Amino acid sequence: MKRAILIVLDSVGIGEMPDAHEYGDVGSNTIGNIAKARGGLHLPHLQRLGLGNIAPIQGVDPEASPQGCYGKMAERSPGKDTTTGHWEIAGVVLERAFPTFSKGFPEDFLQAFAERIGRQVIGNEVASGTEIIQRLGQEHVRTGKPIAYTSADSVFQIAAHEEVIPLEELYRICGIAREMLEGDLRVGRVIARPFLGEEGNFYRTTNRHDYAIEPPHKILLDMVKEKGLRVMAVGKIKDIYAGHGVTDHLASKGNRDGVEKTLAFIREKKPGLIMTNLVDFDMLYGHRNDVENYAQALEEFDGRLPEILASLEEEDILFITADHGCDPTTESTDHSREYVPLLVYGKKVVPGRNLGIRSSFADLGATIAEYLGTEELVNGRSFLGELI
């Protein structure tokens, strides 16, 4: 029974890419800089898999005989956002980046949007999600106008207090936005950002919902499903791929829950693909430049690895990677253009292989496709032959 278990550590980059200067990200190294700022990271289980063999990380030494295979991957697509990174893993390489809106969205779009949803909006600026709800949250509560904002990424985000605009209404509003944002406005994601609390103490809830655009062609998840295998998605994976190929889905409320849901799927012992996104690294710590809690989250995930490894069956292969960087030690609160780590482990995987620098995230998807016996991806070169 062949299974691939793919865990995406959202934003855990491992050093700037050669074109980082084009994105304002020179010097970014999410995991490396966290380790330096912290005086070292304690990640013994990731270390044993070979994490310290990929790049220098203070406190994470290279292993003479790693238990896993190791390398890093470059992003071929332009961009540094969640959708672009995950799509490339699944075989989609973009020719041009999704549009961004550093000065906010066009006024004519906002007026048409307001007419469709029956409410004016406030905001329409580049902002941190946690900051803007503190600044505009009370005005929203008083007027009922949702808060629209964006970031350096290709997103249109709508924040609303759950007691002012109920979740279902917020989701309806976001669905309308997704429908309207086409052509030059075709952002990678529309995101519902519900929050609760009172003035001076507003806080985001875990009821976010992402509205992605449809992938331009068949992706890894579609192919696994067409093979008659299960595609088990944990966290925001289903949203990122607009539901493509997903046969089973478990929402998760943070990293701990995401690991629990992943283990639940592993224990079901059904052949196919289990794909998990652990979002706390990015959402709670990277964007907030919270070095200490980012470090603690990495160490907490490392502490769960023995349980994950012990649950693997004879023909399981575990892949651990990321989708971009989000270095909390820099002045920027946005994603960073970085290589992502690649760790592979399985009972049939030859340990200690250096997989080098892969030229595309799609190499990972191509490897999973070959292992599960699906048709080939449009992009990517499989490295399965280096593993088994």
UniProtKB/Swiss-Prot annotation:
<dbReference type="GO" id="GO:0030145">
    <property type="term" value="F:manganese ion binding"/>
</dbReference>
<comment type="function">
    <text>Isomerase that catalyzes the conversion of deoxy-ribose 1-phosphate (dRib-1-P) and ribose 1-phosphate (Rib-1-P) to deoxy-ribose 5-phosphate (dRib-5-P) and ribose 5-phosphate (Rib-5-P), respectively.</text>
</comment>
<comment type="similarity">
    <text>Belongs to the phosphopentomutase family.</text>
</comment>
<feature type="binding site">
    <location>
        <position position="335"/>
    </location>
    <ligand>
        <name>Mn(2+) 2</name>
    </ligand>
</feature>
<feature type="binding site">
    <location>
        <position position="282"/>
    </location>
    <ligand>
        <name>Mn(2+) 2</name>
    </ligand>
</feature>
<dbReference type="Pfam" id="PF01676">
    <property type="entry name" value="Metalloenzyme"/>
</dbReference>
<feature type="binding site">
    <location>
        <position position="323"/>
    </location>
    <ligand>
        <name>Mn(2+) 1</name>
    </ligand>
</feature>
<dbReference type="InterPro" id="IPR006124">
    <property type="entry name" value="Metalloenzyme"/>
</dbReference>
<feature type="binding site">
    <location>
        <position position="287"/>
    </location>
    <ligand>
        <name>Mn(2+) 2</name>
    </ligand>
</feature>
<dbReference type="GO" id="GO:0009117">
    <property type="term" value="P:nucleotide metabolic process"/>
</dbReference>
<dbReference type="GO" id="GO:0043094">
    <property type="term" value="P:metabolic compound salvage"/>
</dbReference>
<dbReference type="GO" id="GO:0005829">
    <property type="term" value="C:cytosol"/>
</dbReference>
<keyword id="KW-0464">Manganese</keyword>
<dbReference type="InterPro" id="IPR024052">
    <property type="entry name" value="Phosphopentomutase_DeoB_cap_sf"/>
</dbReference>
<keyword id="KW-0413">Isomerase</keyword>
<comment type="pathway">
    <text>Carbohydrate degradation; 2-deoxy-D-ribose 1-phosphate degradation; D-glyceraldehyde 3-phosphate and acetaldehyde from 2-deoxy-alpha-D-ribose 1-phosphate: step 1/2.</text>
</comment>
<keyword id="KW-0479">Metal-binding</keyword>
<protein>
    <recommendedName>
        <fullName>Phosphopentomutase</fullName>
        <ecNumber>5.4.2.7</ecNumber>
    </recommendedName>
</protein>
<dbReference type="GO" id="GO:0000287">
    <property type="term" value="F:magnesium ion binding"/>
</dbReference>
<keyword id="KW-0963">Cytoplasm</keyword>
<dbReference type="GO" id="GO:0008973">
    <property type="term" value="F:phosphopentomutase activity"/>
</dbReference>
<dbReference type="InterPro" id="IPR017850">
    <property type="entry name" value="Alkaline_phosphatase_core_sf"/>
</dbReference>
<feature type="binding site">
    <location>
        <position position="324"/>
    </location>
    <ligand>
        <name>Mn(2+) 1</name>
    </ligand>
</feature>
<dbReference type="GO" id="GO:0006018">
    <property type="term" value="P:2-deoxyribose 1-phosphate catabolic process"/>
</dbReference>
<dbReference type="GO" id="GO:0006015">
    <property type="term" value="P:5-phosphoribose 1-diphosphate biosynthetic process"/>
</dbReference>
<feature type="binding site">
    <location>
        <position position="10"/>
    </location>
    <ligand>
        <name>Mn(2+) 1</name>
    </ligand>
</feature>
<dbReference type="InterPro" id="IPR010045">
    <property type="entry name" value="DeoB"/>
</dbReference>
